[in-house]
Amino acid sequence: FIISHNAANTEPTRYFAWVTVDVVGLEGKRFWQVEEQFIAEGFAADRLIVTATHNHQAPDTIGLWGDPINEISGRDPVYMERITESIEQAVREAAANMLPSQLSVAATSMAEQSLFLTGTKHGGFHPNADAKGMLNDIRDPRIVSDRLLTLQANHLETGSTILTLTNWSGHPEVGGGNDNAISADWVGVTRIALEEHYGGMAIHLPEALGGMQSALFMDLPLINEQGLEQFELCTETDISNSENPFDCFEKEP
């Protein structure tokens, strides 16, 4: 996305472009080439910001998951080049489709949204006792940052949503490490939900992930027929064999 503080149809002198990529991390050389291209076209390189969502379910972009014993990197050179090309393409597409908008920001604590997102150690009902606002700091010292920051851009004339941006500190690793499926993890699911609800485009920027703020094993509660949040107490087989699947759910505390 691109944000410019200039009036519409004027020369852009105050602007920045921000690209976020659904991968575990990126080295600077992935976008230095893009910066050089933009400099050649008269744009300031320091106005380009590139971040990674730290997604653990994407192809390896750092070399973390190869075969270190045999000195084999997990990175695919062809895929890495594709990322560089995609960063440039994303900026150009955003620049070609800029719209006058009004920005609004909001922040909340995830722990304040529901006691079912927080474990018993913090006064909630989540089955993971250490959970706080859908997060668990799995290393000492245990410090949880459960703040959710959002920014939304709405069209200045129609009010329609152009962009919804989220900023939260949960590691995108809820898919675990025992599969070869490629996805954007919870970031991808969140993006789909936000775009279906608000319209426009949804983008996620990671907060202070640290060492570490983990969303792993943070099951979401289900919603029963009465609209109450509950966690299931039985297996998928139990549910499929039951005449009333809601019998498998815990009563509201």
Locations of regions flagged by a protein language model:
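Conserved beta-alpha junction segments in alpha/beta enzyme cores
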Residues: 1-253
